[in-house]
Structure formats: C-alpha cells, structure tokens
Amino acid sequence: MRKRVYYWTDSEHINKPVISDTILNTGVKINILKAKVEPQEAFLILELFGSKETIEKALNYLSKFGEVEEISKVIKRDLEKCVHCGCCITQCPINVIYMDEDYNVVFKEEDCVGCKNCLKACPFKAIEIFE
C-alpha cells in the first residue's frame, strides 16, 4: 500500500530525526518528495509504503511531532482551457506532467503531490486544485 501526506512540524522538532525514527519504530518505508525546512517550521510531502497497519502506525507516530494531512486527488485539468503549451511541465518537481510523442500534455494525476507549481504556471488557468 502507498499513501501520500503533507507533514508540518514546528521549530521544536526540526533538529530531531523524526523521519528516521518513524522508519525505525514502525517499519514503514518513506520517500521524501518535497521538503521545505526553515528555522521556525518545516513542510514535507511524504510518500509512505507498507501495510495498512504499518502506515497507520507511522502516521500516528508522525502526528506526535507535527500535523499530518492525507493527500487525495489533487489536480484537475480543464481540457477545454488547456492548449498543451507545456508551461506546467517544467514546474512539476516529480515529472507527473509530461508531453507525449504527439506533443499533448499528459497528467498522471494519481502521482501528484499537490505542490501547486503547475497551477501557478498555467497562463490559461486550465488547472484546478482540490483542497
């Protein structure tokens, strides 16, 4: 099973090995998809792998040190507004958006992490974010 989450923590926990402790204490595998760490807070997008029970245990552990929010379907593209210009492609940090061999923009929506870079880049406002 795989689950993606947003994770926020404050300055009290930034210098602690929370992610590695979560892995060691629960057996979950964690992929850090995005991390923004500042002196007063940290924001991460995490992808957790394991059984349902292992992932739930890991989420409970992480929530002791910060706020966890599950990422569901994040982006939606309006095909009537999209002109396949590709502005969104270069802004996607995990290559969820790409151009196929026919020069059409393709979204792998199920892999989106919700960074919202594509939304900001689209000059035609063809991308919506589910909050």
Curated annotation (Swiss-Prot):
Cystine residue pairs: none
Cofactor, free-text remark: Binds 2 [4Fe-4S] cluster.
One Pfam entry name: Fer4_7
Self-association state and partner proteins as the record states: May form a complex with MJ0100.
Name of the protein this chain belongs to: L-aspartate semialdehyde sulfurtransferase iron-sulfur subunit
InterPro entries named in the record: 4Fe4S_Fe-S-bd (IPR017896), 4Fe4S_Fe_S_CS (IPR017900), ACT-like_dom_sf (IPR045865), Fe-S_Ferredoxin (IPR050572), NIL_domain (IPR018449)
Positions annotated to bind [4Fe-4S] cluster 1: 82, 85, 88, 122
Species whose genome carries this gene: Methanocaldococcus jannaschii (strain ATCC 43067 / DSM 2661 / JAL-1 / JCM 10045 / NBRC 100440) (Methanococcus jannaschii)
Entry binding sites for [4Fe-4S] cluster 2: 92, 112, 115, 118
Free-text function comment from the UniProt entry: Required for O-acetylhomoserine sulfhydrylase (OAHS)-independent homocysteine (Hcy) biosynthesis. Together with MJ0100, catalyzes the condensation of sulfide with aspartate semialdehyde to generate homocysteine. May be involved in the reduction of the disulfide formed in MJ0100.
SUPFAM superfamilies for the chain: 4Fe-4S ferredoxins, ACT-like
Alphabetized PANTHER family for the sequence: ADENYLYLSULFATE REDUCTASE, BETA SUBUNIT, L-ASPARTATE SEMIALDEHYDE SULFURTRANSFERASE IRON-SULFUR SUBUNIT
Cofactors: [4Fe-4S] cluster
Molecular-function GO terms, alphabetical: 4 iron, 4 sulfur cluster binding; metal ion binding; oxidoreductase activity
Keyword terms of this UniProt record: 4Fe-4S, Amino-acid biosynthesis, Electron transport, Iron, Iron-sulfur, Metal-binding, Methionine biosynthesis, Repeat, Transport
Domain of life: Archaea
Pathway: Amino-acid biosynthesis
GO BP annotations, alphabetical order: methionine biosynthetic process
Residue ranges occupied by any 4Fe-4S ferredoxin-type domain in the UniProt entry: 73-102, 103-131
